[in-house]
Structures are given as structure tokens and as C-alpha cells.
A protein has these predicted regions:
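Conserved PLP-enzyme active-site core in the AAT-like
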Residues: 1-190, 194
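Glycan-recognition surfaces in beta-rich domains, encompassing non-catalytic CBMs
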Residues: 198
């Protein structure tokens, strides 16, 4: 969301985001929200069968649409989780309308579950939490941003300090746990997926 500026618009073509993002976006009023900084938000809900509402997505994309956020996990909703293939189809549709729109995927709970990740099917950025899949159940805190360098750099400038960017950052003495989590994550996620199948 660090790539948004006053006057820009954030669009969710997969319905309402996690409850925890409502105050960040400004769906529920909050100091320092995107809405307070002049960023507007719109969403297009999924169709009742869980498919994308391509007709209304096309209508929703306009000259102010700067960033499209795609939440991969169903979160607290009853909709199905989005596969990487479906995400790729949606991104392709969006890029055919506006190639310059930034497509960001909230990849929480999706890491290591499929052979491909959203960056491999056209996403400009993926973001997620290290306390979920990539942390392997060990990482006590943290998050990640990956994707095209210019967009990641914009996030780094916002999340640390302008001019400093990703050269510094808080580790809270957790570096060892973070690396251990990344090391164990593929095994932990594979075990969870295998267990969930039975």
C-alpha cells in the first residue's frame, strides 16, 4: 500500500479484505488510514459461486486505479481460497485493461502450498506474514514483501525512512528464529497440507 499516493484508488476485485485491514484502508475510520491520506477504496465482490465478476471488475478499473489488491486466502470469509492459476487469470484480465496497474497479492497462508507463487503468474508484488507459513511456526514476528524492485523499494522507503529504505530495519534480536523458520517452513507447510487432506 506504500505505492499509493493522495488521489489514487485501491481496488479489491475479490471482495472485502481481512477485518484487520479495514482500519488501514479506511473502511472503518482510523487515524493515518489510506482514506485519511486521500486514497479511495472500492471493491467488487465475487459472484455467488465464488467466481470473479469480470464485468464489474472491468467497470471498476478507471484512471485513478493505481493498485489492485488480491487476497489469496479466504480469511474469515466463506469463499474458496484462490489458487495461483485463478490469480494469474485475474491478473491477466486486469493487465489487459490497464497494464500500468500494480497487482499486489496478499499471499498469507498461501506460501509453499502450490508449486508456483503469484509472482510467477504476473503479480507485481506479494506480501505476507512470517508468523504464518514462511515462519515455519518458529518466527515470532515479521513480514515480507517481494516483487518488482521499484515497488519493493517504495515499500522500503515507507516502512523505514525515506532515503534509508531497505538498508536498515528492526530485527528485535530475532534473526536466528526468522532464518530457522524460513528453513523449516517448507516441511511444516507440506506436513500441514498432507494432514489437512485426510
Amino acid at each position: 500500500m506504500s505505492n499509493l499516493r493522495p488521489g489514487d484508488e485501491l481496488l479489491s476485485p475479490v471482495g472485502k479484505p481481512y477485518d484487520t485491514l479495514e482500519e488501514v484502508i479506511g473502511i472503518r475510520p482510523s487515524k493515518g488510514s489510506l482514506a485519511e491520506y486521500g486514497v479511495t477504496y472500492r471493491q467488487v465482490d465475487l459472484l455467488p459461486d465464488g467466481s470473479f465478476d469480470y464485468e464489474n471488475i472491468k467497470k471498476a478499473i478507471n484512471d485513478r486505479t493505481k493498485l489492485v489488491t488480491i487476497q489469496r486466502s479466504k480469511g474469515y470469509a466463506t469463499r474458496p481460497t484462490l489458487s495461483v492459476t485463478r490469480i494469474g487469470e485475474l491478473i491477466s484480465f486486469i493487465k489487459n485493461i490497464r497494464p500500468d496497474v500494480i497487482c499486489m497479492v496478499d499471499n498469507c497462508y498461501g506460501e509453499f502450498v502450490e508449486e508456483k507463487e503469484p509472482l510467477e503468474v504476473g503479480a507485481d508484488m506479494i506480501v505476507g506474514s512470517l508468523i504464518k507459513n514462511p515462519g515455519g511456526g518458529i518466527a515470532p514476528t515479521g513480514g515480507y514483501i517481494a516483487g518488482k524492485a521499484k515497488y519493493v523499494d517504495m515499500c522500503a522507503q515507507r516502512l523505514s525512512a525515506p532515503g534509508v529504505g531497505k538498508e536498515v530495519g528492526c530485527t528485535l534480536g530475532n534473526t536466528r528464529s526468522l532464518f530457522m523458520g524460513l528453513f523449516f517452513a517448507p516441511t511444516v507447510v507440506a506436513s500441514a497440507v498432507k494432514t489437512a487432506t485426510f
